[in-house]
């Protein structure tokens, strides 16, 4: 299976927003945008020259299966950012797609922004996300409870 990263568009943002409303995704991935309009506004901000977030689509054999993005990009003193990802097409999960996509995306954001470290938050019960992050060299830095849910902060250094 060929995994590639594609360009996000207003259409893919709409698709992603719709797919991310599924209860199974909602329990693993908190959503910032509460409406498709808000998601599109956030996307428009990523197109600005001084954007602090950047995303790509995840394609498996040309089929749009998920998204990956960095946010809180800080290229200054100690260049760093955060990363998040989601495979919304359930039939494409557990096939190594997210692992490959994250590996590609880490190289891309290093080249594009010169970051030295990348952080990620995930719920402690999200074993699939933890596996993807750890397979890509992320280490658990902290475990904490927020709103009654155990979460982990992981970090990757180049």
Where do the model's predicted regions map?
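Acyl-donor (CoA/ACP) binding surface of acyl/acetyltransferases
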Residues: 1-27, 53-158
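Conserved GNAT-fold acetyl-CoA-binding loop/helix
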Residues: 24-44
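Short loop/turn motifs at secondary-structure junctions and domain boundaries
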Residues: 46-52
């Amino acid at each position: 299976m060929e995994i590639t990263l594609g360009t996000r568009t207003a259409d893919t943002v709409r698709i992603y927003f719709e797919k991310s409303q599924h209860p199974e995704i909602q329990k693993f991935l908190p959503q910032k945008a509460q409406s498709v309009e808000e998601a599109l506004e956030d996307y428009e901000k990523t197109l600005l020259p001084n954007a602090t977030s950047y995303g790509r689509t995840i394609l498996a054999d040309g089929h749009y299966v998920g998204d990956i993005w960095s946010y809180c990009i800080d290229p200054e003193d100690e260049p760093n950012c955060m990363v998040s990802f989601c495979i919304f097409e359930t039939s494409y999960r557990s096939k190594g797609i997210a692992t490959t996509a994250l590996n590609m995306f880490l190289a891309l954001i290093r080249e594009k922004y010169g970051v030295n470290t990348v952080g990620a938050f995930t719920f402690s019960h999200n074993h699939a996300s933890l596996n993807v992050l750890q397979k890509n060299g992320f280490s658990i830095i902290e475990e904490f409870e927020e709103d009654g849910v155990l979460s982990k902060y992981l970090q990757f250094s180049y």
